[in-house]
């Protein structure tokens, strides 16, 4: 690998803005905000959705069936 061309990979704290849940992970993302997490200071990255608030992971998922073009065609012409 060539030196000085890759972004710095470091630990950062991601915070779900809808639930306030925080978790530590590695990232190359930069931030001006910092937060104290488990006794250490890390850069803070705010996210709108994480595994703590996403419906797939929380079990509060809604299943909606959107009619596609084929379904609309079949309805229109009385097929099936």
From Swiss-Prot:
<comment type="subunit">
    <text>Part of the 50S ribosomal subunit.</text>
</comment>
<dbReference type="InterPro" id="IPR002150">
    <property type="entry name" value="Ribosomal_bL31"/>
</dbReference>
<dbReference type="Pfam" id="PF01197">
    <property type="entry name" value="Ribosomal_L31"/>
</dbReference>
<keyword id="KW-0687">Ribonucleoprotein</keyword>
<keyword id="KW-0689">Ribosomal protein</keyword>
<dbReference type="InterPro" id="IPR027493">
    <property type="entry name" value="Ribosomal_bL31_B"/>
</dbReference>
<protein>
    <recommendedName>
        <fullName>Large ribosomal subunit protein bL31B</fullName>
    </recommendedName>
</protein>
<comment type="similarity">
    <text>Belongs to the bacterial ribosomal protein bL31 family. Type B subfamily.</text>
</comment>
<dbReference type="GO" id="GO:1990904">
    <property type="term" value="C:ribonucleoprotein complex"/>
</dbReference>
<dbReference type="GO" id="GO:0006412">
    <property type="term" value="P:translation"/>
</dbReference>
<dbReference type="InterPro" id="IPR042105">
    <property type="entry name" value="Ribosomal_bL31_sf"/>
</dbReference>
<dbReference type="InterPro" id="IPR034704">
    <property type="entry name" value="Ribosomal_bL28/bL31-like_sf"/>
</dbReference>
<dbReference type="GO" id="GO:0003735">
    <property type="term" value="F:structural constituent of ribosome"/>
</dbReference>
<dbReference type="GO" id="GO:0005840">
    <property type="term" value="C:ribosome"/>
</dbReference>
């Amino acid at each position: 690998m060539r030196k000085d061309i890759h972004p710095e990979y470091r630990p950062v704290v991601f915070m779900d803005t809808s639930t306030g849940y925080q978790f530590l992970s590695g990232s190359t993302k930069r931030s001006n905000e910092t937060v104290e997490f488990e006794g250490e200071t890390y850069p803070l990255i705010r996210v709108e959705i994480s595994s703590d608030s996403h419906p797939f992971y929380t079990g509060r998922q809604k299943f909606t069936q959107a009619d596609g073009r084929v379904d609309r065609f079949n309805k229109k012409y009385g097929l099936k």
